[in-house]
Curated annotation (Swiss-Prot):
Listed GO MF terms: protein folding chaperone; unfolded protein binding
Annotated GO biological process: protein refolding
Membership in a protein family: Belongs to the HSP33 family.
Protein task: Redox regulated molecular chaperone. Protects both thermally unfolding and oxidatively damaged proteins from irreversible aggregation. Plays an important role in the bacterial defense system toward oxidative stress.
Name of this protein: 33 kDa chaperonin
Alphabetical keyword list: Chaperone, Cytoplasm, Disulfide bond, Redox-active center, Zinc
Disulphide bridges, residue numbers: 230-232, 263-266
Posttranslational mods: Under oxidizing conditions two disulfide bonds are formed involving the reactive cysteines. Under reducing conditions zinc is bound to the reactive cysteines and the protein is inactive.
Organism expressing this protein natively: Sodalis glossinidius (strain morsitans)
Gene Ontology, cellular component aspect: cytoplasm
Length: 292
């Protein structure tokens, strides 16, 4: 069967608990792109991608979420950015050797998990928690406990399906303002923990959910597509260039004959020669914003 990158929300009718399931392959492949990341970093980016998708699905308004790991280890930064429409992009910055089987702590060192919520309207919110668990899922569960005080469990799997990278996961969370019995939540978490990566990668979401919860009353909502989408553009690059001084632009052109701006998220190049720079400067002087 053809794999589709999708997220499903579901609700346990007899408990005050909601769930989400996401399975990703093409989006994951595009995030990795042409980067030659070590295996451990590829795995971690897959986990971050799944986590970001699951977190954006909890939002009730138009916004973006950025989930990033940063520290003093050889993996300086790993970040995934997503929005409520399930558009995803991400990258990693490496400064040192990383073993194929490196743990989260070995990669990041002394570091933090930073989650930034940027709503279309209103103030930006940023939460920071230490890396107090051996897995990314542990750190995220700790974030929810500290920031939202909502019992939350994440179950993330990465691997391969039909020869391509694959990542998937589930989220369980007590509904805000509701009192779910701890025993009920633990029961659902124990069931969910039995899921295997191969099941999540290969089976339709309804089949996975039936296997896990066939004795419970579960409502599954329509799927939402997940896709890689980079927000870079020629216009954004042009606007950035116009923040530079005239001498700095002159020096860049004199050295290379053009300004080549590269997007690390998607690999796109935006090139501006001397004539293009002159046009931008003239437009800026006239108060005109360049178009993509």
């Amino acid at each position: 069967m053809t794999h589709q990158d999708q997220l499903h929300r579901y609700l346990f009718e007899d408990y005050a608990v909601r769930g989400e399931l996401v399975s990703l392959q093409e989006t994951y492949r595009q995030v990795l792109g042409q980067h030659n990341y070590p295996p451990a970093v590829k795995t971690l980016l897959g986990e971050l991608l799944v986590a970001t998708s699951l977190l954006t699905a909890t939002l009730k308004f138009t916004s973006e979420i950025t989930v990033q790991l940063q520290g003093d280890g050889p993996l300086r930064l790993a970040v995934i950015n997503g929005d409520d429409r399930q558009n995803m992009r991400g990258l990693a910055c490496i400064n040192g050797d990383i073993a194929d089987d490196a743990t989260l702590a070995q990669m990041v060192g002394n570091g933090y998990l930073v989650i930034t919520l940027t709503p279309a309207e209103g103030e930006r919110y940023q939460g920071v928690v230490g890396l107090e668990g051996p897995r990314l899922a542990d750190c995220l569960e700790n974030y929810f406990l500290q920031s939202e005080q909502l019992p939350t469990r994440l179950f993330i799997r990465t691997g391969e399906y039909q020869g391509e990278v694959a990542a998937a996961g589930l989220l369980l969370q007590v509904l805000p303002g509701q009192d779910a019995h701890a025993d009920d939540f633990d029961h659902l978490a124990q069931l969910t923990a039995t899921v295997k990566g191969d099941e999540l990668f290969a089976l339709p979401a309804n089949d996975v959910l039936y296997r896990l919860y066939h004795q419970d009353n579960v409502t599954v909502y329509p799927a939402q597509s997940v896709q890689f989408l980079c927000t870079c553009s020629r216009q954004r690059c042009a606007d950035a260039l116009m923040t530079l001084g005239e001498q700095e632009l002159h020096d860049m052109l004199e050295q290379d004959g053009e300004v080549d701006m590269h997007c690390d998220f998607c690999g796109s190049h935006y090139r501006f020669d001397a004539d293009a720079i002159a046009d931008l400067q003239q437009q800026a002087a006239q108060g005109y914003s360049p178009q993509a």
